[in-house]
């Protein structure tokens, strides 16, 4: 049933009408605890981030464990103890319970809508401005880490998530070997806290040379899926800028 909850959530993110199909054709699931938790998707119109099954499992796993590889999740569900390299029944049960809670956190209406408000609030109002679902996956996992662990003030959560997402897109932080990069960042966050980790990453990657040379060179490319260009457009949306040669049409309207 948990597997179906993941599958149905992914399907409903794309096709809200599928809810009625589930109600009519899957009586067992319709009577489960998960059905009413998906009911809000009947009216969902979100298109910026439509997570697939792998994305849902990845986000659920990452914010519940200090790990990021889905292969590790498979091992844990098989009962593997990474320290002793033995297989234990209690690990299977504990992993399933944590994964279930993780999935419930991911599909929770308030969590998902508040996360999307943060992303949209940063200027990313369309899927046209998103070229890295991996960056969104980590940003959502980070959001869930912050709201569940409550390590930072609630009023700061969205700002931190926005900064992390923009930084990761601008620098291509998760463009290659994303699971290894996820694990590294989760480890740093657990060791130093998210605020200090973010400050260190900013200091290490967003230097004057980055802004004066790398960004300028990236903007010289003509590709419309260039990450730097997409962040530039999002910044214009954020600032409510007018489009070129227009006195009343905003960039937001044209995207």
List each language-model region with its residue ranges.
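Solvent-exposed functional surfaces
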Residues: 1-203
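Intrinsically disordered, low-complexity N-proximal targeting/linker segments that flank membranes
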Residues: 169-254
